Curated annotation (Swiss-Prot):
<feature type="short sequence motif" description="Effector region">
    <location>
        <begin position="32"/>
        <end position="40"/>
    </location>
</feature>
<keyword id="KW-0378">Hydrolase</keyword>
<keyword id="KW-0547">Nucleotide-binding</keyword>
<dbReference type="GO" id="GO:0019901">
    <property type="term" value="F:protein kinase binding"/>
</dbReference>
<keyword id="KW-0007">Acetylation</keyword>
<keyword id="KW-0449">Lipoprotein</keyword>
<keyword id="KW-0963">Cytoplasm</keyword>
<dbReference type="GO" id="GO:0032956">
    <property type="term" value="P:regulation of actin cytoskeleton organization"/>
</dbReference>
<dbReference type="GO" id="GO:0030865">
    <property type="term" value="P:cortical cytoskeleton organization"/>
</dbReference>
<feature type="lipid moiety-binding region" description="S-geranylgeranyl cysteine">
    <location>
        <position position="189"/>
    </location>
</feature>
<dbReference type="GO" id="GO:0008360">
    <property type="term" value="P:regulation of cell shape"/>
</dbReference>
<dbReference type="GO" id="GO:0007264">
    <property type="term" value="P:small GTPase-mediated signal transduction"/>
</dbReference>
<dbReference type="InterPro" id="IPR001806">
    <property type="entry name" value="Small_GTPase"/>
</dbReference>
<comment type="subunit">
    <text>Interacts with DOCK2, which may activate it. Interacts with S100A8 and calprotectin (S100A8/9). Found in a complex with SH3RF1, MAP3K7/TAK1, MAP2K7/MKK7, MAPK8IP1/JIP1, MAPK8/JNK1 and MAPK9/JNK2. Interacts with PAK1. Component of the phagocyte NADPH oxidase complex composed of an obligatory core heterodimer formed by the membrane proteins CYBA and CYBB and the cytosolic regulatory subunits NCF1/p47-phox, NCF2/p67-phox, NCF4/p40-phox and the small GTPase RAC1 or RAC2.</text>
</comment>
<dbReference type="InterPro" id="IPR003578">
    <property type="entry name" value="Small_GTPase_Rho"/>
</dbReference>
<dbReference type="GO" id="GO:0007015">
    <property type="term" value="P:actin filament organization"/>
</dbReference>
<feature type="modified residue" description="N6-acetyllysine">
    <location>
        <position position="147"/>
    </location>
</feature>
Length: 192
């Protein structure tokens, strides 16, 4: 069985841990708990192929900037996450996460993931953003950013409702099993 290492990065509180817990346990966790490296392992079938998917959670907070890259070696695919209702987390994909991932892993495939899809149409959330002269991130905006960072795919999901959730991980596996023809075969990430 092929083992795939998938590392999830993004700002603190965008829902990385909820994404992983909801996917692996089919249950949405309660309160927000900042993360320091939790690992999950799941045996899954994608396109009739059994895969052992190793899921590596990371801490988005700046306090962990020096520690986080220790989880990057031998990564097969990255999920760079931002919250669809946090324009700052969207901007940080460009400003922080993409440069960090590419610095350590120049050719590892990336999937861009917009989280908290259930809140994009939530009236209270929209109102709170409007008070700050902000708005939720739209699908075309996500697509444009994915193109800019040369992401394999752009996907949106909700860990709460599980909408689009399975697709995120299926596509992460496909990005490794069936690399895009325009890309040369990727070497796993390594830090020297």
């Amino acid at each position: 069985m092929q083992a795939i290492k998938c590392v999830v990065v993004g700002d603190g509180a965008v829902g990385k841990t909820c994404l992983l817990i909801s996917y692996t346990t089919n249950a949405f966790p309660g309160e927000y708990i900042p993360t320091v490296f939790d690992n999950y392992s799941a045996n899954v079938m994608v396109d009739s192929k059994p895969v052992n998917l190793g899921l590596w959670d990371t801490a988005g907070q700046e306090d962990y900037d020096r520690l986080r890259p220790l989880s990057y070696p031998q990564t097969d695919v990255f999920l760079i996450c931002f919250s669809l209702v946090s324009p700052a987390s969207y901007e940080n994909v460009r400003a922080k996460w993409f440069p960090e991932v590419r610095h350590h892993c120049p050719s590892t495939p990336i999937i861009l993931v917009g989280t908290k899809l259930d809140l994009r149409d939530d009236k209270d959330t929209i109102e709170k953003l409007k008070e700050k002269k902000l708005a939720p991130i739209t699908y075309p905006q996500g697509l444009a950013l994915a193109k800019e960072i040369d992401s394999v795919k752009y996907l949106e999901c909700s860990a709460l409702t599980q909408r689009g959730l399975k697709t995120v991980f299926d596509e992460a596996i496909r990005a490794v099993l069936c690399p895009q023809p325009t890309r040369p075969q990727k070497r796993p990430c390594s830090i020297l």
